[in-house]
């Protein structure tokens, strides 16, 4: 599978490492050159995929990262707005079917997932659910 990851922080770089170790072709876009530098991001040590530095919502940047031939796009920048824009561009302009955007704000996640039909993951909700389950489980014991 050919996967484009937008955002090369902890999640993006770790995801790239895991996908590449499983035999997938991976490209990464980040607006920070230092995030794409293995000297600054140890998870990229040995990474053989394409790294593109540029604004993730720039169509030319996305094209240079290979969005036109990718099977999946994952947007995991620190910005909900950037992630949702990348998801919309990937689906509407480039026709990518498998697109996921990380959204931190639970209220926004509901709007994007519901009204806009964009697949999202909300770490805030996942964390709260896990903590509640853990707390309630201990309460039941």
Which sequence ranges carry the predicted segments?
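Cytosolic regulatory regions of ion transport systems
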Residues: 1-141
